[in-house]
């Protein structure tokens, strides 16, 4: 009798586990949203328990580590944001009714990646508690930068490069070529993102090359003018540069020499100004002799006047 009951007991246990086991799902594998906009990452959970003691957690999965997006406890409903998601992430208003979705605002290219939704309930720890969704932020290509690698001299090999620093999905690149008469010319297309290789170039290689960078969000362009020259022109260019450098050095030398001479003249003038000006207070000998005679005459006059005064004094007393 007991042996016959074992299958029934196992069935009841299996049913109980199935009923209590939590199930977390993300209905979409990939979501697309434009840069600067908002996106809702959907996530739902199913459980037979009515208790909501636990939390909802979202993380971004990186190659080397996990980056926290947000933790939302059922008990106090207080957000615990990751550093890069403060004031940008909010949980669904129906979080307690099986909706664990989040909304991310102000999307940037850095938000590209895979996100994991996790629901943990203390009363239902069995089952599938996690699910993932990939977010692709759509960004139009930035204006590409065009460049030439190598010297545009007849017989050389050169490469034309084109690269947008931003763009999601990754921009696709294409090239067009026009001669100096603005007529489109054939051009072998490289693999997208690879440079255009031009080998053994000649004057026929000269012209305008236009690169187009595009994805589903937009298109941008850049262009290069290729002017192929002969080696003799290259030598003339170097000679011209050398002459210019020598001339500049000569001019600089002249300026330095003039400044030094001017400095010496200024020092000489300062020294002369510092010497006492003897002419200002030395009188010529003739003037000194004249002054001496005038002083002698003045002294004689005073002595004579004193003698005269002495003779007249008795008469004045008698009167």
UniProtKB/Swiss-Prot annotation:
Signal peptide: 1-21
UniProt-annotated stretches for the region Disordered: 267-319
Topology class, membrane: Single-pass type I membrane protein
Extracellular side: 22-235
Topology Cytoplasmic: residue spans: 257-319
Glycosylation site list: 112, 200, 223
Lineage of the species this protein comes from: Eukaryota, Metazoa, Chordata, Craniata, Vertebrata
Cysteine pairings via disulfide bonds: 43-117, 146-222, 162-211
UniProtKB keywords: Disulfide bond, Glycoprotein, Immunoglobulin domain, Lipoprotein, Membrane, Palmitate, Signal, Transmembrane, Transmembrane helix
Ig-like V-type domain ranges (all copies): 22-134
Protein name: Cell surface A33 antigen
Post-translational modification: N-glycosylated, contains approximately 8 kDa of N-linked carbohydrate.
Source organism (scientific name): Homo sapiens
GO molecular function, one term: signaling receptor activity
Cellular component, GO annotation: extracellular exosome; plasma membrane
Ig-like C2-type domain sequence ranges: 140-227
Top-rank taxon, per record: Eukaryota
Ranges that cross the membrane: 236-256
Residue stretches of biased makeup (Basic and acidic residues): 267-295, 303-319
Tissue: Expressed in normal gastrointestinal epithelium and in 95% of colon cancers.
Pfam family, any one: V-set
Transmembrane as UniProt keyword: yes
Location(s), subcellular: Membrane
Gene transcribed to yield this protein: GPA33
Function: May play a role in cell-cell recognition and signaling.
Gene3D superfamilies, alphabetized: Immunoglobulins
